[in-house]
Amino acid sequence: AEAAYKQMANMGPLSTADMIDYADVLRGNGHYNEAIAQYQAISASDPENVRVKSYLQQADFFMRLKRDSTRNSVRTVPINSAEADLGVTVMDDLLLFSSARGEGIGGKNEYQWDEQPFLNLYTALLKGQTAVEPYVMRKDVNHRYHDGTATYDSLAKRLYFTRDNVFYGTLNKAKSGELKLGIFYTDITAGEFSQKEWGGLVPFEHNDPEFNTGHPSISPDGKRLYFVSDRPGGRGGTDIWYCENLGNNKWGVPSNMGEKVNTSGNEMYPFVSGDSVLYFSSNAHPGLGGYDNFYCRLTPSGPSAVINLGYPLNTRFDDRNLILLKDDSTGFFVSDRTGGQGSDDIYGCTVHPPMQMIRGRVIDKKSREAINGAVLDIKDGNGRFMDDAKITMLEDGKFEIEVPFANAYAISGTKNGYLQNSVSIDPNTDPLDDVLLELDKYDYGAEGIVMHGETMAPLTGVKVGLYDANDKLIQDLTTAADGKYTF
């Protein structure tokens, strides 16, 4: 594709859409400097293009993602085949996944679109940090079409999974004749699936034959179901949505995760860890390849800034579908990177969200002397407090802040007797190892005398305080022998 786009560019000007595709291909092939040059060319003619701006705002982003290679680790697992293996999730002591290895229900049926075997659900035993002994699941779940990405509600003993929108043998096709994806669920008892052939299978109430609904992911408390859909109201190709559990097998109206998470591209494979972190895959958030793995924290006010998990979890290939075990650090993901057995392979991983260190000093603006004991906080480029930042105050006014990657930071500081001040940092252009935060002393003056209310005699040793407009104490002192005070 890269050669074809290069030839097209040599023949004449490309459209903006073709230029973006060309830049994305360059990025996917690991040619990051050339990709940045292409994005810059697009920006010259379309300066308000949101997707292009996101890449240009962090021109060295790709190199920094690749450098952070020691925090995460990747390992192979012995359950892959020569076909596609993907769609991982965890059910108690089992790893569930989808495979096109052709050992499923009905034999090796082929999907006409790509002449590949239909996907079926398999299980494998979790053993430490790996999985072994893959085994195809029963026909209570698998059928002769696609059966894919699943999620397990351990509290309700219920499995939600993606399949072609087929129920009781009826193909629920769109008006165009296309068979879309839907979510279905079945309950499990005593570690076994329901013995009813299809009686235990229930369609998700928000399935619709006119659009795809899939990639379900239940929150650890079972109160929210996340899923992927191309339904109306989204921002791009496929968006991440969620529904609240209303009880009695009812779900609230689907809500879109919003512009923090969803883009003009495709977001897929949501997964929520025990510490309220949403992991997902995207081909439009700035990343190393086609699809990268990302995360953001879920807060009462909404999702935090989206962070790329970096290399080696992400490469120039398609890396996606990250899930974690109960320890929130050991997990699995899917990639089509080189060196695998099939078109898609399952990999084990150890995950630590990427962080970077900001170092600096707090000083008096006039005297340039170090200020000890200042209180700092840090916000991202959207003005949100970065609650997961680790701020350490050292001697001589020095500080260290370990913080996730972001496009911009604002560090603010204060101390009694000083005005609050902040410094903005662009990690793409500003040094992160010598940040200066300058604080100004309050510019005030006040003097007076404290006297006895009746005798009018000066009072010695009376405590006097100076407060700001918010009743915050700025300074206190005691009166001199003549009853006078001076601030």
Write out the residue ranges for each language-model feature.
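Canonical positions in the second alpha-helix
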Residues: 7-8, 41-42
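Short, ordered, surface-exposed loop/turn motifs in non-cytosolic proteins
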Residues: 237, 367-383, 454-472
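Short, conserved micro-motifs composed of acidic
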Residues: 18, 28, 32, 45-361, ...
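Short, acidic Ser/Thr/Gly-rich low-complexity loop/linker segments typical of extracellular
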Residues: 381-398, 470-484
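Structural marker of alpha-solenoid helical repeat scaffolds
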Residues: 11, 44-45
